[in-house]
Amino acid sequence: MLHGLLDKTYVNKLKTSPSYSEESFAREYMSIWSGSSDDSWFNFDKLQKYRKIKNPETHAKFRPGSNQFYLISVDVGRINDQTVACVFRVNVDNTGKHWATLVNIKVLARSAETKTFTQQAIDVKRLIRDFQPREVVIDTNGLGVGLADEMIKAQYDEMGEYYMPYAFANDETYYAIQPKDAPKILYGLKANGPLNSKIHGNAYARLTSGMVRFLIKEQEAKNALMSTQIGQKMSVYKRVERLLPHEMTTKLFEEMANLRLKRTGNSTDIVLEQINARYPKDKYSSFAYGLWRIKEIEEEYTKRARRRFGGNGDGKRKLTFFT
């Protein structure tokens, strides 16, 4: 397709056929590597078993009686890079463990017209409207400052719809300039070298311990969808839209499989580099930022429980008996 050897109509027919597989199409027709390498830091094949979730979520679904919340994490891109938002549903069990489910991945700023930080802020605020998250994590190093500056302002979209400003709960540089009455749901993350090492280590630990669940593969989702009357009656556009979160999850897995441990002078630091330098890592960055903040929230939850109940934070009061 790159050299004009494949007809575009033929390619589109392939992609809409019942037997279409994103992975096989990428390998056979686009010469794109998929899968893992012996150098990969993450075990691609092992992680596949955590792809259990059949349906993505497009808005908040708060289940009665459950202790859950949503969290959105954003890795900011500009010009040639993508801005990626990962949407997590976090369920807290009786022991205080925070189990994460990646229910959607949104790529913002797909075209040149939507790459402005004003438009990206509107897109993030639409996600806030839909998912009512407890927090929105933004990497405020470098380019992220541009998005952060817009998030504390109000905007109107092309239809005249109003989007309210939000405020940072943890970044002192914004305290004096952000609206005093704006909801403080923004969390600024300044990912420098030492912190990045911890973020990578946390992502590895939570993934290998099975504390994260993902959407099933797009081919499985497509087969399930096409077995229903609703799926069969869907337009091609609606079908692609429905399956897109599954494809984005596969791309996240491919990005993780493309990361290897970089040799550094400091053996205690975890520094990851791309095996194929042309392959992006923005989805992984957004994903890892979210997992890091979930870990911090879990630790804060455990500390509060220990202060309240004593003991190990499992919600059971520790009693002392005297004789």
Each language-model region and where it sits:
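Nucleic-acid-processing active sites and adjacent nucleic-acid-binding tracks
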Residues: 61, 81, 87-138
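C-terminal nuclease/phosphodiesterase catalytic domains that cleave nucleic-acid phosphodiester bonds
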Residues: 28, 32, 36, 40, ...
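Repeat-solenoid scaffold signature
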Residues: 133-137, 144-154, 183-188
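ASCE P-loop NTPase helicase motor core
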Residues: 1-14, 145-171
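ATPase catalytic-site recognition across NTP-hydrolyzing enzymes
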Residues: 1-74
